[in-house]
A protein has these predicted regions:
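Non-ligating segments of multi-cofactor redox enzymes
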Residues: 1-114
Length: 114
């Protein structure tokens, strides 16, 4: 197998703007509703009463999620139509003409990526 590729993501700089998601969609010209990359928000906490004022104890952070092109991808193994394959360069490929949209790949993926 050739050199493996990756997508560099610096979470400390992410503001959740989804520019990476839009750029991926634009680059690959995916149809409406298909996002090969998506930005996920994790947030929580609450406001605390401190004396007679409210004090924020909240957090929010974002992460960019996409296929990690695993060496032994379970998504390829669970696909009932063999729409998902591993190319010679190690990337996972989805053959749209075979895919029936069952989402078994997404359910099996430890990253919920496809």
């Amino acid at each position: 197998m050739s050199e493996r590729l990756g997508f560099y993501f610096d979470q400390s700089l992410c503001t959740g703007c989804k520019a990476c998601q839009i750029a991926c969609k634009d680059k690959h010209d995916t149809p409406l509703g298909v996002n090969w990359r998506r930005v996920v928000e994790f947030s929580g906490g609450s406001w605390q009463v401190v004396g007679d004022t409210f004090s924020p104890r909240v957090f929010a952070y974002y992460t960019s999620v996409a296929c990690n092109h695993c060496e032994d991808p379970i998504c390829v193994r669970v696909c009932p139509t063999t729409a998902m394959t591993v190319r010679a360069d190690g990337t996972i490929f989805v053959d749209d003409s075979k895919c029936v949209g069952c989402r078994y790949c997404e359910w099996a993926c430890p990253y919920s990526a496809p």
